[in-house]
Amino acid sequence: MSSRKAADLKEAQAHLGTRGIRAQWIAADNSKDDDISRLVDDALAKLGRIDILVNNAGATWGAPTEDHPIEAWDKVMNLNVRSLFLLSQQIGKRSMIPNRYGRIINLASIAGLRGSTSATQTIAYNTSKGAVVSFTRALAGGWGPYGITVNALAPGMFPSKMTRGTIEQVGMDKLTAGVPLQRIGDEDDLKGAALLFASDASKHITGQILCVDGGVTAVLSSS
């Protein structure tokens, strides 16, 4: 597993250890090309091969489109799209393609499937997640002959560092008002979907976007 902060990784490693799971970690900043290369080098050195890749790094920025800083736009695109491409490219070329096997799981968002009102001010985030959706489908078509499946999870509202401000500002009642299941996601709700895409239970599923959103997109699609 990997993220920017070693302290967070150590904590996660210890948590998994209490459950009898042996985990290794590599600290890396996926917004930096050199860190991505080092991450792949170190992971292959530790593991020998990489069969499952979960592209989970992401960032957002809130600003009106007409005043959106170009630096902020580039930051979101660099982490949410460019790093995902580079990591998939390197792991595919160096491990999955030679081994004729791979499971790639990209974290998209329902924000990448539709527009949003001016209240959200997340033009860069929405655009980047739309790119993740297209990337997932394109890569699935391109790498299918190598035995590699590529799918994406598209979460709705989940509590996280990224959404904390929105939850506090908007309030839980408003956030769940349009959700058929009348709740936002919790820490368990993505696990089963991720396990499906990571396992051979999904060996004939590729290029798919699975919404984990309590039914939000189902309601929007029918309206």
Where are these regions (language model features)?
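Residue(s) in the substrate-gating loop at a strand-loop-helix junction
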Residues: 109
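Conserved glycine-rich Rossmann-like NAD(P)H-binding loop of the short-chain dehydrogenase/reductase
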Residues: 1-11
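Alpha-helical segment proximal to the catalytic Tyr-Lys
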Residues: 93-94, 141-142, 203
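Substrate-binding pocket helix/loop in short-chain dehydrogenase/reductase
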Residues: 36, 64-65, 69-74, 175
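Short, small/polar-rich loop/turn modules that mediate ligand/substrate recognition or access, typified
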Residues: 144, 149, 205-207
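Short C-terminal tail/terminal secondary-structure segment
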Residues: 114, 195, 206-223
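Active-site helix of classical SDR
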Residues: 88, 128, 136
